Amino acid sequence: TLPGALPSIGGKPARILAMTHGFHGRTMGALSATWKPGIRKPYDPLVPNIEFVRAGDKVALHDAFAQTGLGRYGKGPVAAVILELIQGEAGVQPLGADYVKFVRELCDINHALLIIDEVQTGIGRTGKWFAFQRDDLSGGVTPDMVTFAKGVAGGFPMGGMIAFGEKLAALFTPGSHGSTFAGNPLGAAAGLATLGVIEDENLVANAEARGEQLRDGIMATGNPLFVSVRGR
């Protein structure tokens, strides 16, 4: 999904950085950015030049960018970083707003894209349409691309991607991306109906309220086994 966005330095292919414990799907491209070895191994070889950095580790991310260079041991440039604001596969672990801001800064400095996967967190689940709209999760960062699926059509197969800005949108020229079942009438109708119900019944705000109620209720039990409630 990044045609034309993968430059090279000295003939070295560009890289995409993904997070340890990240999960992005089971189709070939998404699986290539998914960390869990047990899921990946049966499908090797996967898409090359995707590297994993320790989630939440600023030093590791900085070092991954710093490996770009023209020298013998230098690597190609980083074209994009893909991450989830809350890692479900890691046990519902937020990356942290401060870390996400750091990722955005490094992407801007190095002319790399920031892709946020909102398949699990989008469509109102965190009390906002998208988790990146919550400053306590994203630090106010706006990604270059957002992916979404699942909740957008109420369980019917449907997914999509939002690209922000004319430069990024220009990468997708007619015929550069397609799918046999993309934009099918039944899926589109299911998506429109689902979004209509979410808006009409104010379900995004309700998710925020119910989340706070659940969090407060769990901690109010005083059970020593409960030390925190993660997620939103």
What do the PLM-derived regions correspond to, one by one?
Residues 1-232:
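Conserved N-terminal phosphate-binding loop of PLP-dependent enzymes in the Aspartate aminotransferase
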